Regions:
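Structural preference for solvent-exposed beta-strand-turn elements
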Residues: 1-207
């Protein structure tokens, strides 16, 4: 079924029960109140198979912690195709912490959270930001996610939702070397005041 068209129809339907019926393999009818829609689907055989991600060796992460890491780093990902490795977010998994890093070569965002009793296999994963954005939006903060890795895929699931994504291949650049080690220049600022000032200045700032 065309996903975009189905989403648009569902968004406009009234808060009433929806009856869904299928005739053949490629025709679906949706009925809600006095509204009736007929959709022409695609052959089932053309739908891609799910990646071979087995959750036997999975680990668990609180969705709220994952959302915090994503929202503080994914915005810095590069959108240029010349360096595809920077089009992903680096997710570092360690025994006692997990960290996400993103950079476009001009700016860098990094956030780290402590982890107690982690069962995640230590390693580095490079995840597409679009997949992380879907995870951030689909899973409530209070849920605990089950995560597993396949050959080149990553799977996230809760009792009712599953998300799979292909990982970005290749070694991530050594971002640590661009972060000053002995930097005595820093400042403390009120977050609300700084955010307000930046919003005012961005009105006249050029791209």
């Amino acid at each position: 079924i065309p996903a975009k068209k189905l989403s648009e129809i569902a968004r406009e339907l009234p808060p009433s029960p929806v009856k869904i019926s299928a005739s053949g393999e490629q025709r679906v009818t949706l009925e809600c109140g006095r509204s009736k829609f007929k959709l022409l689907g695609l052959p089932r055989d053309e739908f891609p198979t799910f990646p071979s991600v087995r959750f036997n060796d999975s680990w668990r992460v609180k969705s709220g912690e994952l959302q915090k890491l994503i929202s503080h780093t994914a915005f810095a990902v590069s959108t240029e195709e010349s360096r595809p490795i920077l089009n992903g977010v680096l997710w570092e998994l360690r025994d006692d912490r997990m960290r996400m890093v993103a950079t476009n070569g001009h700016r860098l965002a990094k956030m780290e959270l402590p982890v107690e009793g982690s069962t995640a296999p230590p390693g580095d994963l490079i995840v597409p930001p679009k997949a992380l954005d879907q995870i951030r939006r689909l899973f409530p903060a209070e849920e605990e996610l089950e995560i597993a890795r396949g050959d080149n895929h990553l799977g996230f699931r809760s009792p009712f939702t599953s998300v799979f994504t292909r990982l970005v291949e290749g070694p991530y650049p050594n971002y640590e070397q661009v972060i000053p080690k002995d930097n005595d220049r820093y400042c403390l600022a009120d977050k609300a005041a700084l955010t307000s000032a930046l919003k005012r200045m961005s009105v006249i700032a050029s791209d």
